[in-house]
Amino acid sequence: MTSSTSTAATAQAHGRFIRGSVSKVRRVLDQIRGRTYRDALIMLEFMPYRSTGPITKVLRSAVANAENNLGLDPASLVISSASADMGPSMKRYRPRAQGRAFQIKKQTCHISIAVAVQTDS
């Protein structure tokens, strides 16, 4: 993207303890980073990944924060940063042969999205 963003008017939202691996969430975030709010919503709607649901919720929350707290127009917003960090793993046990048990880790992640006003340069 050729447009730059302003750091003065930035709104952000976080989704914490989201079920799903970090790598699968980052795969989607890499595709919407730097895009406008409308383009990102359209892309998320038609992507075949399970992680698009929580990402859409966090994106809508960030835009609502920009609209209500900063008075910004949603049509002029661009995703300035989007990241996913590792959360705690839930440990479960699966019974195996001869009385053994294998550990299964159900991964979680933290999603952070920041939106800013798009400036034409």
UniProtKB/Swiss-Prot annotation:
Complexes and interactors: Part of the 50S ribosomal subunit.
Species, as recorded: Synechococcus sp. (strain CC9902)
GO BP, one annotated term: translation
Keywords of this entry: Ribonucleoprotein, Ribosomal protein, RNA-binding, rRNA-binding
Annotated gene: rplV
Function: This protein binds specifically to 23S rRNA; its binding is stimulated by other ribosomal proteins, e.g. L4, L17, and L20. It is important during the early stages of 50S assembly. It makes multiple contacts with different domains of the 23S rRNA in the assembled 50S subunit and ribosome.
Gene3D superfamilies (alphabetical): Ribosomal protein L22/L17
Record's keyword annotation contains Ribonucleoprotein: yes
Keyword Transcription: no
NCBIfam families: rplV_bact
UniProt protein name: Large ribosomal subunit protein uL22
PROSITE patterns linked to this entry: RIBOSOMAL_L22
